[in-house]
């Protein structure tokens, strides 16, 4: 069975004048339910304050929790922060952390939300409030794990790179469209900047050729995977040209590289944008099911 972490509060009401698809997580949940007995559901707890503040400035954390984020920061995030959004922002990092803990026991687990890689120390950005990847990685590192964050979203994981820079137990990898958001890039442990319009074969070659040596150099205990589907050719905010089959091949490649090294992997959904929310949700679900199928029956080394 595939371990999937989900919380009812992942599905928050839509915000006015926001380009973020608030019903995407509900569609992901419903499609995964259709998979029936192949899914085992887990519900996360809210991430404790100390870990939110381990990644983010305490003043910004308080602004979010108390739903008093300044308008300038809300504009940068892309939607207003009300009490329901603030609650969701605290639960999603708990989901990514729980997925990681489950992966350490089972080989693979997925958070049905998360991947908020643009959130920075003092502010959110790009539809990201708190950086669940950085928060979970810092907590796992404090527990003695070496973590590699692999970010395959079409946008660079700038917030994740900035929040974990210099941490001796955390490394970051980002493969993204060079000319896409954010305009000002951070420095990951390894950045792979791709030209516009790159298709399946060239993308997968670049991914395999760059991620393989990084895995061998960093020797992590766990991979946190940002499995954004916005490299898809028709994505509203993407600049790459991957097909649905190319995305599936991407998941198989990432899974194979992890399995060959005995590494557990926890995934988050990341980005995916367009008018057809159901089609986007299907891509996210295909990623989870593909990763889960790859890890099924694999005996990873004990950690």
Name every feature range the model reports, one short phrase each:
Residues 9-15, 46-50, 71-85:
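Glycine-/proline-rich flexible loop or hinge segments
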Residues 47-69:
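Charged, often glycine-rich, active-site loop that binds/positions anionic groups
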């Amino acid at each position: 069975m595939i371990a999937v972490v989900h919380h009812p509060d992942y599905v928050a009401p839509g915000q006015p004048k926001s380009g973020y698809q608030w019903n995407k997580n509900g569609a992901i949940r419903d499609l995964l339910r259709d998979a029936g007995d192949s899914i085992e559901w887990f519900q996360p707890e809210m991430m404790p304050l100390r870990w939110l503040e381990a990644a983010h400035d305490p003043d910004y954390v308080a602004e979010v929790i108390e739903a008093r984020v300044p308008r300038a920061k809300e504009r940068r995030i892309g939607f207003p922060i009300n009490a329901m959004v603030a609650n969701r922002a605290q639960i999603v990092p708990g989901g990514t952390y729980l997925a990681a803990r489950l992966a350490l026991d089972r080989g693979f687990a997925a958070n049905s939300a998360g991947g908020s890689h643009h959130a920075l120390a003092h502010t959110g950005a790009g539809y990201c409030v708190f950086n669940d990847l950085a928060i979970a990685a810092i907590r796992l590192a404090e527990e003695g794990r070496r973590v590699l964050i692999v970010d395959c979203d079409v946008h660079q994981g700038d917030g994740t790179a900035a929040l974990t820079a210099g941490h001796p137990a955390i490394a970051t990898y980002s493969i993204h469209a060079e000319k896409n958001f954010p305009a000002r890039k951070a420095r990951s442990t390894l950045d792979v900047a791709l030209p516009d319009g790159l298709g399946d074969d060239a993308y997968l070659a670049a991914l395999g050729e760059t991620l393989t040596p990084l895995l061998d150099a960093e020797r992590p205990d766990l991979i946190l995977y940002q499995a954004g589907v916005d490299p898809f050719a028709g994505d509203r905010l993407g600049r790459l040209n991957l097909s649905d089959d190319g995305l599936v091949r991407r998941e198989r490649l990432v899974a194979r590289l992890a399995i060959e090294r005995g590494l557990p992997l926890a995934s988050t959904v990341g980005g995916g944008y367009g008018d057809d929310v159901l089609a986007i949700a299907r891509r996210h679900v295909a990623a989870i099911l593909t990763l889960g199928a790859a890890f099924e029956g694999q005996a990873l080394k004990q950690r």
